[in-house]
């Protein structure tokens, strides 16, 4: 039971997105169609199977989040995917579990979120601590948790895996699975989606991160913007996870 909240334009790309969501049973009541506004479009250019460039077509507007926000409490978990384009002014969202993929440098905008999932670049911009190794990652995350009352930070380290830091000195390092010639398009979205569904079910951050790690490895083994199924993740875990 998934719902999507956001904006699209009244154009062919918006229609394609709505059609894709409908075909997968996603509730689209929370999507506003804005007249004379282009649907954000990302066009990726590949050479020899590797992405070499990306062209973005977009227009930033002032948008007031619609009525769906009032119903967030009806859902087990809310994923806030922030691209720092002005739509999200702050993360004061009354969700049962709020998990944030941050883009803004000021993590205080996400205060009280349960989990945030920055990559190394995003983490470095949010802290004055020089990120150079796992020890500095833990120090930076611990400081940000203390300042912003997060339950956990899942720091994404690319092909080096993840570091999970929580309150009360909780620290876990998860090694990434090796994938030959990976396509990392959408890998972060796969991580936060898998992490969210697992955490909503188990409330076990380490187990959820392992599940997300396997989901990401499955996704990046496919070309382009790929999705993964529960069966694919379970098969990957059976043959690869320790």
Task: Give each language-model segment a name.
Residues 6, 82-84, 102-104, 120, ...:
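Active-site proximal loops enriched in glycine and acidic residues that flank catalytic Cys/His/Asp
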Residues 3-4, 42-44, 54, 79, ...:
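Structured core elements
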Residues 48-60, 117-126, 203:
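A polyampholytic, Gly/Pro-enriched intrinsically disordered region
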Residues 83-85, 90-171:
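Conserved phosphate/ATP/ADP-binding segment of small-molecule kinases
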Residues 21, 43, 78-81, 162, ...:
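Buried hydrophobic positions in well-ordered alpha/beta secondary-structure cores of metabolic enzymes
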Residues 55, 126-127, 165, 219, ...:
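Residues that scaffold the ATP/ADP-binding catalytic core of kinase and kinase-like folds
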Residues 1-77, 227-242:
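Conserved N-terminal subdomain of the carbohydrate kinase-like
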Residues 151, 177-240:
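Conserved post-catalytic alpha-helical subdomain immediately downstream of the catalytic base
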């Amino acid at each position: 039971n998934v719902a999507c909240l956001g904006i699209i334009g009244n154009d062919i790309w918006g229609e394609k997105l709505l059609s894709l969501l409908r075909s997968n049973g996603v509730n689209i009541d929370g999507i506003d169609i804005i007249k004379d506004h282009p649907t954000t479009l990302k066009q990726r250019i590949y050479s020899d199977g590797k992405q070499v460039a990306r062209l973005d077509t977009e227009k930033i507007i002032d948008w007031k989040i619609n009525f769906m926000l009032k119903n967030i409490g009806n859902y087990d978990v809310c994923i806030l995917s922030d691209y720092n384009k002005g739509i999200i002014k702050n993360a004061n969202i009354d969700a049962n579990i709020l998990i944030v993929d941050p883009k803004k440098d000021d993590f205080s905008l996400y205060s009280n979120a349960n989990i945030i999932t920055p990559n190394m670049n995003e983490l470095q911009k949010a802290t004055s601590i020089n990120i150079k190794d796992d020890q500095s990652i833990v120090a930076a995350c611990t400081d940000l948790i203390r300042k912003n009352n997060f339950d956990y930070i899942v720091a994404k380290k690319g092909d080096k895996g993840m570091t999970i830091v929580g309150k009360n000195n909780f620290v876990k390092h998860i090694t990434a699975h090796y994938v030959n010639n990976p396509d990392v398009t959408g890998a972060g979205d796969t991580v936060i989606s898998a992490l969210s569904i697992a955490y909503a079910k188990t409330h076990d951050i380490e187990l959820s991160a392992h599940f997300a790690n396997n989901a990401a490895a499955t996704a990046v083994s496919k070309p382009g913007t790929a999705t993964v199924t529960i069966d694919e993740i379970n098969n990957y875990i059976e043959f690869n996870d320790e």
